[in-house]
A protein has these predicted regions:
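C-terminal lobe/tail of nucleotide-utilizing enzymes
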Residues: 77-145
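A contiguous pocket-lining binding segment that forms or flanks enzyme active sites
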Residues: 58-63
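ATP-dependent carboxylate-amine ligase catalytic core
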Residues: 1-46, 53, 67-74, 78, ...
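Active-site phosphate/pyrophosphate- and oxyanion-stabilizing loops and adjacent acidic/basic residues
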Residues: 49-50, 102
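Glycine-rich anion-binding loop/nest that anchors nucleotide
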Residues: 64, 68, 92
Length: 145
């Protein structure tokens, strides 16, 4: 998308910008959403996986709870492990699929299922968070919620 818009992503500028935003947000956590997936290139020679390996942030992996999620999510977890990165949690978004959740739960410290929130706004997110121990789990609490 950046190339199509005539933009160049400089990993050094990204690093400096993130550092400034983390400092501004402190002590609150800063959420950074990656675009697309782990192997999406930021430059022709630098992927989002490379960026994560360099920055070493706390990672919460979000995946669709649908057909194909086992392969896609397990491949992503394998790619993270190859870089010595371990997600704090996995959030499966969509209709619950007990078999998928059970299979993936064995590979992550914490697993949560999130229904489609409509409308997707602050009130819907706050309502879901009020009923789920995700923040505690990501910081080091319960196993699965």
């Amino acid at each position: 998308a950046a190339a199509a818009a005539g933009k160049v992503i400089d990993p050094e500028v990204l690093h400096d910008s993130l550092g400034a935003r983390v400092a501004e947000a402190a002590p609150a956590p800063l959420v950074v959403e990656l675009a697309g997936g782990l192997q999406v290139p930021l430059t022709p020679a630098f992927t989002q996986a490379d960026w994560l390996a360099r920055e070493r942030p706390r990672i919460v992996l979000v995946a669709r709870s649908a057909l194909g999620t086992l392969n896609h999510t397990l491949l992503t977890l394998e790619a993270l492990r190859a870089r010595r990165l371990t997600p704090s949690a996995l959030i499966l978004v969509g209709d619950p699929h007990a078999e998928n959740a059970a299979t993936l739960a064995a590979h992550v410290p914490h697993l949560f299922e999130l229904p489609i929130l409509a409308p997707l706004d602050r009130a819907a997110i706050d309502g879901w968070l009020a009923d789920h121990p995700i923040a505690e789990a990501i910081r080091g609490g319960t196993k699965h919620g």
